[in-house]
Amino acid sequence: MNFNQINKVMNALNLGEVIGEPVEVKGGLLHKMFRVCTLSGSYAVKVLNSEIMKRPTALKNTINSEKIAALFANSIPVVAALTVDGKQIHEKDGCYYMVFNWIDGKSIFAPDIYEMHCANIGDILGKMHSLNIIVNGVVPEEAETSLYEWEKYLQLAKGQGITDKTWMEQYEKSLNDIIEWNKQVCEAQEVLVQNQVISHRDLDPKNVMWNNDDPFLIDWEAAGYVNPYQELLEVINYWADDGKGNLDKSYFDAIVKAYGKHMNLA
């Protein structure tokens, strides 16, 4: 990605002539992000990974995720891609781009997470779930009910000639439990898919930007249908972690109390 390419994108979207060199923002795992200043303002430009975008459903999924973000932006603090000519995903010279208004802020992680942050996240999550939005083209998930060949894996491991067999012995000892747990997961999935809402689905600390005490939800690529209480448990594990692998009860309570203002927990 060079200056000329970004300048072409910004001009094509009528966002102004670029001032100075774009600055790469580190931290993205799959895509590249740049801070770009133009005569009209400051923007974050996401350059989508070209290899990922070759996948058959990648463009459709990305478009749907931004439709979800845009709809939620009416009710919760969301950083959604700018819509230009009715599109949030823009193609230029074979590459795909998303452009966002720049927001000053940073993600926070344990041990810098406090009750206030947890209460904010619980409140936002509860609001999202209570809205129960519908987006054309986004369909509920089917249950993932794969029973894995755990016994086959054990026999394959035994045939590898592994010298350190400590883990293999533990695997064999736990084999019946593992098979039973797998069955229970499949049964639980059949129940969970009966109650689904559209949500963010990846609300861990790296996907929330904080400007002072104000949160903004970013990176909506994973957005879609999920069981609300399954996501609540995932969010609790993300945000109530004390940084040492344990859950802080006061943080747990803050999330649940705020969430319960919008969703029934009885």
Task: List the predicted regions and their residue ranges.
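Juxta-kinase regulatory segment immediately upstream of eukaryotic protein kinase catalytic domains
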Residues: 1-21
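Active-site activation/catalytic loop segments of kinase-like enzymes and analogous catalytic loops
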Residues: 229-264
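Active-site acidic catalytic loop and adjacent metal/ATP-binding pocket
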Residues: 29-38, 44-45, 183-230
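A conserved alpha-helical element in kinase catalytic cores
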Residues: 48-94, 116-119
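Conserved short submotifs of the Hanks-type protein kinase catalytic core
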Residues: 93-106
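A cross-family kinase active-site recognition segment
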Residues: 111, 115-170, 196
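Protein kinase-like catalytic domain
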Residues: 73, 129-133, 240, 260-263
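Protein kinase glycine-rich loop
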Residues: 22-27
